[in-house]
Design a protein with these regions (language model features):
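Phosphate-group recognition and catalysis centered on beta-loop-alpha active-site segments
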Residues: 1-331
């Protein structure tokens, strides 16, 4: 399974309807939709609540007084935050490319697309599914769960309501809920029948563990016992790709860990993140040059992960990833 990570952000500004539509038309059946809440209780597709880096909000003088500093999961962040805007206000903004140094061509599309609500993404998914005669789905991700609970604007009840309203509260739904936190997924497992995916990072610990003084880290979640615990509430594991195949001291691809085998033994499917074609994101020996916007040999990287037994992965260039998949399957 290839999941369009934030749509197809190798080609269009991330998390826009244009990015999702392109991903589906390229051939993936799934897109990853990060969700954060608005002031009026809507869910919008953004990677984090701070929108200065992915929209033109700084050019809107009417919102200048909304700029503030927030401590987000222990990190001090200054900017503009979705929870301080209504959906209607967010709709007056336009998306811009997050990493123009790596994706200068995407700046062509700056200012063309609005911020999308999750409902709009679901509507697009349904419409394109009918047109393309395929079952298309989303991987909604609850971002910064503990933070939004702490300010009284939790994402989870809103997500549950949207899933139910759209007939997605079922085990075979074309939706898979993701989170880097644990307690919210355990709670969601009791509330909905939609499948769950536990995300893990190569470093650090889940924000809910840190907030509660739980000393466990992401490394503890991916031990054989940790994976058995995850499998009690989740069907999928979404590790950092470095947890599947770490880089060596020269930043080249190393040897696969036992993670895939251990996760499969626990009954989990493994879908790591994130595959990107541009040089800075690739292992050193697969880079074509020092140019930050040039492509390197991502096919070799992706082939190594298929050989390691993963069940799919998240990719910024879905067309490239699908080509890797077809090569692996011998099509």
């Amino acid at each position: 399974v290839i999941i369009g990570h934030r749509g197809a952000p190798g080609y269009r500004p991330e998390h826009t309807l244009a990015s999702y539509e392109l991903a589906f038309r390229m051939g993936v059946d799934w897109v990853d939709v990060d969700l954060v809440p608005t002031k009026d209780g809507q869910l919008v597709a953004r990677h984090e609540p701070e929108i200065g880096g992915t929209t033109d909000v700084a050019k809107h003088p009417e919102f200048a007084n909304r700029k503030k500093t927030v401590v987000l999961d222990g990190v001090t962040t200054t900017g503009w935050f979705t929870q301080d805007f209504t959906l209607a206000e967010l709709k007056t903004l336009r998306a811009v490319e997050r990493i123009p140094q790596n994706r200068p061509h995407n700046t062509l599309y700056n200012g063309r697309y609005r911020i999308a609500s999750y409902q709009e993404v679901l509507d697009l998914t349904t419409r394109l599914g009918r047109e393309l005669h395929r079952t298309l789905g989303t991987y909604p991700e609850v971002k910064h769960s503990t933070f939004f609970q702490s300010i009284g604007n939790p994402t989870e009840p809103k997500l549950v309501a949207i899933l139910r309203r759209n007939g997605l509260d079922r085990p075979d739904a074309p939706a898979i809920i993701q989170s880097f936190e644990v307690s919210n997924l355990i709670a969601l497992h009791q509330q909905v029948r939609t499948p769950l995916l536990q995300l893990t990072s190569a470093t650090g610990a889940p924000a809910d563990f840190v907030a509660k003084g739980d000393k466990r880290t992401y490394a503890d979640l991916v031990t054989p016992q940790g994976l058995r615990d995850v499998a009690k509430y989740a069907k999928y594991l979404g590790p950092d790709k470095a947890q599947v195949i770490p880089r060596d001291k020269n930043d080249n691809l190393g040897t696969p860990t036992a993670l895939v085998a251990d996760a499969h033994k626990a009954g989990l499917k493994v879908q790591p993140y994130t595959f990107r074609n541009e040089n800075p994101f690739l292992p050193a020996n697969l880079r074509s040059s020092a140019e930050p916007d040039a492509y390197g040999d991502v096919f070799t990287e992706e082939a190594a992960f298929f050989a390691a037994g993963v069940d799919g992965f998240f990719a910024d260039q879905p067309d490239t990833a699908l080509e890797s998949l077809h090569a692996f399957l011998g099509r």
